[in-house]
Amino acid sequence: MHRLDRDTGGLILFARYGETAARFQKNLDRILLRKFYLAVVRGKFPEGEVECHMPLREDPEDPIRLRMHHRVDGKECFTRFKLVRHLDCPEIAPELSLVEAELITGRKHQIRAHLAEMGYPIVGDRLYYRDGEFYQKLAQGGELTDEDIKVLGAHNQMLFAYKVELQLPYWKEPRTFESHAYPADMAKLLAE
């Protein structure tokens, strides 16, 4: 009923029957009230809440066409970020932060692009970290080496859709669902 970026893990809504999905799809904004993600980012994210209003769009001049960029003529995007805690893992980066992101709008690569543009790229993000160097290597038929994975900090990007708030027509109150079944690299880091 909704989507996640290709390399993003976490909660996703499915309907058992096509007819149910079609009916709910029309009213998704009234059913799926809030979506929250956890991201491990490079850098010391500021305390408190950070609101990011940054329009995004693809750049036809970018050799990686699918990457989103901050452009004044882009689609309006709004993400609310909040520091959960700073992390200590010098083998990945001198400073890391666990950040909660709430999508207010839902655009392609919104969280990844916003964090990268703000100077806090997501650990393991092949597309937005180091100007897409690792994404390009894979796109050209190459494979990532152990050294590449070490530089990225993880085998997978550390972005996880961990919580949704839903309101179905037959419920009196909205309900919240959470998952903490993180990918192995992320689970190991968060357990430390």
Predicted features by range, described:
Residues 1-192:
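RNA pseudouridine synthases
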